[in-house]
Structures are given as C-alpha cells and as structure tokens.
C-alpha cells in the first residue's frame, strides 16, 4: 500500500511545520478575489430566493465575504505549505544528486547578445 512521502501525516489540513512559514498577506489579490466570490454568492443567493439582489440582506453578504476570506486565507496557507514542501524535496534531491545537475558555465551579456550597430 502506498503511504506517500515519509513523515507525512495523513488527513491533516495544516501540519505544525506550516507555522514556521510567513502568513499570507491580507492584501493578497487572491484573498480579494475569494472575498469577491463571497459577495457574488450572496448576490446569487438573493436572486435565487427572489429578493432584491443588491439591497436585501447586506448583513448576509458581509457574512459571505468574511467567511470566504477566512476559508481562502487557510487555503492559501495550505498552498504555500505544499509549495514549500515540494521545494524542500526538490532542492534536497538536487543537493544529494549533484552528478545529475552539472553547473553551467556563466555567460556575460556581451556573449549572449549580438553586437549593436545603430542604423541611421
């Protein structure tokens, strides 16, 4: 039976190692987008229940926005953690297998670009 990566706890949304990562910024555009989705879901809820779409239930729309941003914040935190785990595994593999990843010789910009001749 496949158990996945060693040391990985199953069915755990945010492990304790995720606390060492910096939290997502509250000004992240992805959070604003998720909040906008919450606002739109409040509008759709009003439209389905045949209420005035923009004016009815402003408190409900605010509740949708805050709950969507709250859930989105933890989803972003999980996404950042998963990317950090992937990067850690990838860099440790590169470090332990240097023969598969040879150092490339560094070129200067003069070697990369062609010589410039202005046309007048």
From Swiss-Prot:
Q: Give yes or no: UniProt keyword Mitochondrion.
A: yes
Modified positions (N-acetylmethionine) in chain numbering: 1
Q: Which Pfam families match?
A: NDUF_C2 (PF06374)
Highest taxon above the source species: Eukaryota
Q: Please provide the record's keywords in A-Z order.
A: Acetylation, Electron transport, Membrane, Mitochondrion, Mitochondrion inner membrane, Respiratory chain, Transmembrane, Transmembrane helix, Transport
Q: Which GO terms describe its biological process?
A: mitochondrial electron transport, NADH to ubiquinone; mitochondrial respiratory chain complex I assembly
* Segments traversing the membrane: 57-76
**Does Transmembrane helix show up as a keyword for this record?**
yes
Cellular component GO terms, alphabetical: mitochondrial inner membrane; mitochondrion; respiratory chain complex I
Localization (cell): Mitochondrion inner membrane
Its subunit composition reads:
Complex I is composed of 45 different subunits. Interacts with TMEM242.
Function description: Accessory subunit of the mitochondrial membrane respiratory chain NADH dehydrogenase (Complex I), that is believed not to be involved in catalysis but required for the complex assembly. Complex I functions in the transfer of electrons from NADH to the respiratory chain. The immediate electron acceptor for the enzyme is believed to be ubiquinone.
Name assigned to this protein: NADH dehydrogenase [ubiquinone] 1 subunit C2
Encoded by which gene?
NDUFC2
């Amino acid at each position: 039976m496949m158990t996945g990566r060693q040391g990985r706890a199953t069915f755990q949304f945010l492990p304790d190692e995720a606390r060492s990562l910096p939290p997502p910024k509250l000004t992240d555009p992805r959070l604003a987008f998720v909040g906008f989705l919450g606002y739109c879901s409040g509008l759709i809820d009003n439209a389905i229940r045949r209420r005035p779409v923009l004016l009815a239930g402003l408190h409900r729309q605010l509740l949708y926005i805050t709950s969507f941003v709250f859930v989105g914040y933890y989803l972003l935190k999980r996404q950042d953690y998963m990317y950090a785990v992937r990067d850690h595994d990838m860099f440790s593999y590169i470090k332990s297998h240097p023969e598969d990843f040879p150092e490339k010789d560094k070129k200067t910009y003069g070697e990369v670009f062609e010589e410039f001749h202005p046309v007048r």
